[in-house]
Amino acid sequence: MSARFLTLFFALGFSALTIAADGDAMRVRNVVLVHGAWADGSSWAKVIPLLEKAGLNIVAVQNPLTSLSDDVATTKRAIALQDGPVILVGHSYGGMVITEAGAEPKVVGLVYVAAFAPDAGQALGDLGKEFPPPPGGAEVRPDSAGFLKITTKGVVESFAQDLPMQERRVLAATQGPTNAAAFGGKVTNAAWKAKPTWYVVASNDRMIQPDLERKFAEAMNAKTIELPSSHVPMLSRPGDVAKLIVEAAKKSGTSVKGK
């Protein structure tokens, strides 16, 4: 067993003990994690053990990334399988998905991780036009079937620039091609208007402008933390992200927003 692995193991274990011991008892036990574009459920691999050690039941969906409606339907199925109230967590494009799927009655809280948070009637392409294009956007390439991928250069320099190089290259190699049509899907409900929200701003994000993330968080009146992270804080700062999700599980489930 390598020294690097042992260091990571004990660091994650210590973080889990800290999270589990911190604060009030859990009000919600179920957490559904929704990945973003060019990713899959394994993007939560560093957060899941921390949440489980805190006593939470975790499901990470595997969305097809074929359309917003397909991804919402997949996420709703995961929500329906839970045995009680749910905290719904979305990363990046996954914020579009949880904004729509979050209207499900079982969902009692929403956590956005460097994620889009549209209003009803908006598509991803409608968001952020008032800000300069993020650098990583220039590294997105379409294929002949209309699916999008990020170049290896884009992943290394703009998607996950604060991860070890080996992890960055794995993300580039395993990314899920995303149908461009998914970015044109409009949400019909903005669940964040009715349910408690939390937001992780990634201040070094090069895929979504950090100021746009701050704008989303402010519009939702979300409990917000800001991390000096790339676009993937759940991989570069898993302890901080897990701690916020645990907070949501402890504080959700008793009221709707504004009550």
Task: Describe every region a protein language model picked out.
Residues 170-192, 203:
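Active-site nucleophile elbow and catalytic-triad environment of alpha/beta-hydrolase enzymes
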Residues 110, 198-205:
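Conserved strand-to-loop "acid loop" that flanks and positions the catalytic carboxylate
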Residues 36-39, 92-93, 116:
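Active-site glycine-rich loops that stabilize anionic/oxyanionic intermediates
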Residues 203-229, 235, 248:
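Conserved loop-alpha-helix segment in the C-terminal half of the alpha/beta-hydrolase fold
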Residues 89-94, 98:
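Gly/Ala-rich beta-loop-alpha elbow adjacent to hydrolase catalytic centers
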Residues 6-16:
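Bacterial N-terminal signal peptides
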Residues 24-84:
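Active-site catalytic motif of lipid deacylating hydrolases and related acyltransferases
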Residues 106-107, 111-152, 156, 179-182, ...:
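Flexible "cap/lid" loop of the alpha/beta hydrolase fold
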